[in-house]
Amino acid sequence: NTLVGAPGFDDTVQGIRNAVAAGLMTSVNTPLCSLNRDYAATLRFVHELGVRYVTCSGLIPSGGAETEASQATRLTQEELTAVLRQAVETAEELGMEIDFTSPGWLPEETLRGLGLHLIPSCGACLSNMAVTPDGQVVPCQSWLGGTTLGNLLTDDWSAIWDGETCRAIRAKSAKLEHICQLGEGNREGC
């Protein structure tokens, strides 16, 4: 609850249990920060719930994480590498799959050295988009401020998908440059 700034942990855990019980392939993503530096404990917990695939990312300054207090919990590259090293070892021990999803946060050599084979690139408008509770379509799940592509409740999907902004973001993502478009200029995106 502290990490996301809202109550909901118990509901989230129940949702994971329900998804696993229904036979759905369930993945859990965790933004890594000083509040959950012992990510290995999180992996053990979700493994007990039946989760076998996890992703993690750096703490992205978007949405509720835009506050100074939240940004103060961000891990340095060295801290993030240490947390990931332990996470990869724990995932191997538990027979889980793990991927790091923040493009540009750690050098490719570091990720490969940790045994991570997927080197993240931005997937905005290419492999992922998201819908906010009020129906706004955003380029990715972290893109919570600024650019919206339309409203799923009121706009035709093809107008959103084929819109000029969506096409421009998708074209940039398709270059697979291992950067986050949210962080261009300040390197603080995904």
Name each model-derived stretch:
Residues 2-124, 128-138, 144-151:
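Radical SAM enzyme [4Fe-4S]-AdoMet core and its adjacent flexible, acidic
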Residues 112-113, 136-137, 141-190:
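Flexible mid-to-C-terminal extensions adjoining Fe-S/redox cofactors in radical SAM and related proteins
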